[in-house]
Amino acid sequence: MLGAVGPGALWGFEREIMNLVPMVVEQTSRGERAYDIYSRLLKERIIFITGTVEDNMASLIVAQLVFLEAENPEKDISLYINSPGGVVTAGLSIYDTMQYIKPKVSTLCLGQAASMGALLLAGGEPGMRYALPNSRIMVHQPSGGFRGQATDIEIHAREILEIKRRLNEIYVKHTGKSLEEIESSMERDNFMVAEKAKDFGIVDKVIDKRGGEQI
């Protein structure tokens, strides 16, 4: 949660971080060209999901996915995830785009993939979902709060239960587990080491060295 940090402070912090992003200089036939490191990696079809999943970040991820599809619809895309989760609807916009576009999307967890981060990790192409050995994965049911009239509270309660049902169905689809197993596993915060996430069906392989995998 962001707590009492206002959007102005957050964007100021992000600007400071961007000032620290390394630049990569390449020689081309037209001379030198400088890229920030993330733009250079985007040329290699690598996208990073880092930090809280929210609308601004999700729109950038979706735009990158669609751009890479337009550039080459037959070439795989790699999604590197280090996220504590965030807003469900923002995460689902990324997930739906991953399923919608033509390129296969491989996923790799480095650091952590919690909440919506875990769902995006699980939503990668079957056989192409990876985790580094010391990464942590956490799944749970959605949470939220609402204040208002009793009828409005009831409406929002039905909505969060519908979201819970939809998320559970997504996990059933990508893990191969039954709905009952998923519901039981999501009842409380469920932390997993990489190997346990593999057994659960969120990832296909735990890797500690780069091999023949396209990631």
Curated annotation (Swiss-Prot):
Keywords: Cytoplasm, Hydrolase, Protease, Serine protease. One of its GO terms (biological process) is protein quality control for misfolded or incompletely synthesized proteins. It catalyses: Hydrolysis of proteins to small peptides in the presence of ATP and magnesium. alpha-casein is the usual test substrate. In the absence of ATP, only oligopeptides shorter than five residues are hydrolyzed (such as succinyl-Leu-Tyr-|-NHMec, and Leu-Tyr-Leu-|-Tyr-Trp, in which cleavage of the -Tyr-|-Leu- and -Tyr-|-Trp bonds also occurs). The active site is at residues 115, 140. CDD domains: S14_ClpP_2. It is found in: Cytoplasm. Fourteen ClpP subunits assemble into 2 heptameric rings which stack back to back to give a disk-like structure with a central cavity, resembling the structure of eukaryotic proteasomes. This is ATP-dependent Clp protease proteolytic subunit.
